Design a protein with these regions (language model features):
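N-terminal pre-Walker A segment at the start of P-loop NTPase domains
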Residues: 3-32
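Walker A/P-loop nucleotide-binding motif
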Residues: 32-50
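Active-site signature of alpha/beta-hydrolase-fold catalytic machinery across serine-
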Residues: 49-53, 57
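Post-Walker A helix-loop "phosphate-sensing" segment adjacent to the P-loop in P-loop NTPases
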Residues: 56-66
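A short hydrophobic beta-strand->loop->alpha-helix junction that borders the nucleotide-binding pocket
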Residues: 64-71, 96
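Conserved nucleotide-sensing/catalytic segment adjacent to the nucleotide-binding pocket
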Residues: 74-123
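Canonical AAA+ ATPase core
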Residues: 117-143, 150-152
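C-terminal alpha-helical "lid" subdomain
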Residues: 142, 148-206
Length: 206
């Protein structure tokens, strides 16, 4: 499977909100009985690159999608629960799929909850969502229940000091990181006067 994201070695300085470091967080997640992980925050903050690191560091073969037509197919979920090939289900840009059911427009959540319940009996199979949602109140509370959800991780822009530390770790050319208050990870690797690269999804769709 081809996985996109920043073509850079991942450094802990990219994600200062992991107090024990990125790799320790991933190890704790895969050692946990909880199977759901939610990565939320604005575009450009490194969610896809973090996913890429999870897959590569844990040697994971994932089913990855963002396509509602695929997700509405019950066989897609059955295959994930029963096959021995895939050990992670990743739903990218899952904003509309994560909305509270009481809002009335989300018929996918019941499927996700059923799959999560099924995974409790299957070790080493995980379900990861990425979303640009900025508030956890916009995600169905049942998905975030302790025991089901390992963590909801907010991805944010870096402060100027954090950006400088991340740039130093990555070996980037010196810049005035204090020229603006915050930096997205995407802007960190963007050359001056270069347009921000278009986002590419990881998964398969239409």
């Amino acid at each position: 499977m081809h996985v996109t994201g920043l073509n850079q070695k991942l450094h802990n300085e990219f994600y200062p909100w992991f107090p024990k470091g990125v790799d320790q967080f991933i190890e704790d997640y895969y050692a946990s009985a909880a199977n759901v992980l939610v990565l939320y925050g604005p575009p450009g903050t490194g969610k896809t690159s973090f996913l890429r690191h999870i897959l590569l560091s844990q040697n994971i073969n994932a089913m990855v999608t963002y396509d509602e037509r695929i997700l509405k197919d019950d066989e897609f979920f059955i295959n994930y629960l029963t096959d021995d090939e895939h050990n992670a289900l990743i739903v990218e840009d899952a904003d509309v799929f994560l909305a509270p059911r009481e809002d009335g427009d989300n018929d996918m959540m019941s499927k996700f909850l059923n799959v999560s319940d099924g995974l409790i009996k299957i070790m080493n199979k995980k379900m990861i969502f990425t979303t640009n949602i900025s508030q956890l109140s916009k995600i169905d509370a049942a998905l975030l229940r302790p025991g089901r959800c390992f963590a909801c991780v907010e991805f944010r822009e870096l402060t100027s000091q954090e950006a400088g530390a991340a740039a130093l770790a990555a070996g980037l050319a010196p810049r005035d990181w204090h020229s603006q208050n915050t930096w997205s990870l995407a802007h960190l690797f963007q050359k001056p006067d270069e347009p921000v690269a278009k986002k590419f999804r990881m998964g398969f769709g239409s």
